[in-house]
Structure formats: structure tokens, C-alpha cells
Amino acid sequence: MTTLRLLISDSYDPWFNLAVEECIFRQMPATQRVLFLWRNADTVVIGRAQNPWKECNTRRMEEDNVRLARRSSGGGAVFHDLGNTCFTFMAGKPEYDKTISTHIVLAALNSLGVMADASGRNDLVVKTPDGDRKVSGSAYRETKDRGFHHGTLLLNADLSRLANYLNPDKKKLAAKGITSVRSRVANLTELLPGITHEQVCQAVTEAFFAHYGERVDAEVISPDKTPDLPNFAETFARQSSWEWNFGQAPAFSHLLDERFTWGGVELHFDVEKGVITRAQAFTDSLNPAPLEALGERLQGCQYRVDVLEQACESLIAEFPAQKGELRELAAWMAQAVR
């Protein structure tokens, strides 16, 4: 009986694909080696412990219909579009070894005519006259008895959009001697004009089979019907929820300040797991009562635009004379928090 399993998703939904990945990882036998190939439409994927409000331009994402997806592995934020080919390798311990899966990806690239090398913790780079250029980034997750390595290959990604949605860590970039995110990455189409997602998937699949000396038919995973995976519906519901994607952010504080024609406003928020644990409002307005009431009302609310707007709207009945001010405040908060 084969120990290999090959799955290919024809969905571009990041929540669907990450839910499939999670279900397979939880339920795979310890003796199985899995390759899962997939790709996402416009998405910012963040690491398990990251703060989306800090890492991402959430307002721009909302305007451009870019999704946010929190993965279960660590690491940083990345932008996915259909120019990225995503892979996940899974195996039980003690066999799980990310150097094996890295070797398989390098062998696949080599078979296509691209000589790449592993660099640092999680990158694959190609040498160019302008220096090393990253063509793949990865992240990892391990439990007591199994592990996975997942990553992307930059095939024909719209690199100009990286900067639209990500807020690069300036300290991290300075430590690596990098001037911008865009300058250090390269698409495989620059090296292999005309290369397709299907060709890359085929190369990775063949390298996977060659390494283990076995072949297996691919299982196509489709959103047209619920995948036959135990607990998939519950896993998908969690993966697509605001509570997971935003609410799992580490505790943080946010200070908002603005001057309106009717007075200056400062709002101080302490947020834990996406919920406002403390809200303080300061103002030099001649009528501070609505702001004071807003601070009290926001305590315990989710830190999300619709909730903040609703809190302002709900105060209009109590303070009808300040209707215009409260509407202006709601619009400003929505812009500032997105």
C-alpha cells in the first residue's frame, strides 16, 4: 500500500485551502507523506501570531476586496495572487524533515532549468547580476508526532501589489540590508518565460514521486462539493471567521487622534484577542458627554469597523443635538481602524 498522498485544489479561496490543509494535517496517518498543491486569489496571509492591524493595510485590502487569512504556522505576512503556486509537504515524525521538502522543491526547479539555493531560514533564491533574488518563501509547523512545510513559488505574481497591502518591518529590512520588499523578489517567468502553474505543479509532483520512489493518483479537492474530510465544515467556519483572522491578534494598544471643527479627540484602545478591553476618550469639545459615553460603550466590543460605527449611531438617540458630530466621528474611526 502506498504511503504517498497527492492532493490538488481547484479552489482559489484561501480559507477553503487552509481548512483543507488543516484537516489533512490533523487526520493523516503517521506513516503517510502528503503533497498538497494549491493557490489563492488576492489574499494577505499572516502568521499565526501576527497582528493584522500592524502588518497589513487593512483599509486598502477592504477597498480592493483582498482577503485576510491567518495560517496556523508562524512567520511573516505575504501577499498571494494567482501568480503564486502554493505547496504543502506533510509527514509524521521522525521522518518529517523540512530539508527533504526543500530538496524536492529545488529538484523541481532544477528540472525546469532554474538553479536555486536555500537561503536563511525559509527562502529559496536564484543568483542574478543584481544579487540574490527570492523566488520562494516558506513557513513550518510541528506537533508532537507530525510536521508540515508550506510555501509559495513566485510564478507570475504582481509584485507591484506587494507594497499596497503589507507594512514592511523597517527594523527587519534594515537588519537584512534590504531597501524594499519588491527589490529582493523575482518571478519565475523572468527566468522561464511562459511557465504556467500547471507546469510548476507537475515538476513538483514528479520530484516528490522521484524522491520517494512511488507514484499515486492525484485527488482533486473542489469547493463544488464539501470535501470528504472529517470536521471540514467546522474547520472552514473557523478559518473564515473574523475571530480567527483578526481576533487572534496579540494584545496591542491603539491611539487615534484628530481635530474636528467642534473639538479635538483622542481615543485610547487596549485590545486583546480582537476585543476592546479598555477604551478612553479625551476631548476639548464643549460637550464631552457623547465622547465619554462612547468610551464606556466600546468596552468589551470587538475591534471592528461595523461595531465602532454602530456604537456611534446608537448614541444619536441619547444625544440628538450631536448627531452630526457623532456621524463625523463614526466615519473618522472607520477610516482610522481599517
From Swiss-Prot:
ATP binds at R71, G76, A77, V78, F79, K134. Pathway: Protein modification; protein lipoylation via exogenous pathway; protein N(6)-(lipoyl)lysine from lipoate: step 1/2; Protein modification; protein lipoylation via exogenous pathway; protein N(6)-(lipoyl)lysine from lipoate: step 2/2. InterPro entries: aa-tRNA-synth_II/BPL/LPL, BPL_LPL_catalytic, Lipoate_ligase_A, Lipoate_protein_ligase_C, LipoylTrfase_LipoateP_Ligase. One of its GO terms (biological process) is protein modification process. Coiled coil: none annotated. One of its GO terms (cellular component) is cytosol. Pfam families: Lip_prot_lig_C, LplA-B_cat. Monomer. In the transfer reaction, the free carboxyl group of lipoic acid is attached via an amide linkage to the epsilon-amino group of a specific lysine residue of lipoyl domains of lipoate-dependent enzymes. This is Lipoate-protein ligase A. It comes from Salmonella paratyphi B (strain ATCC BAA-1250 / SPB7).
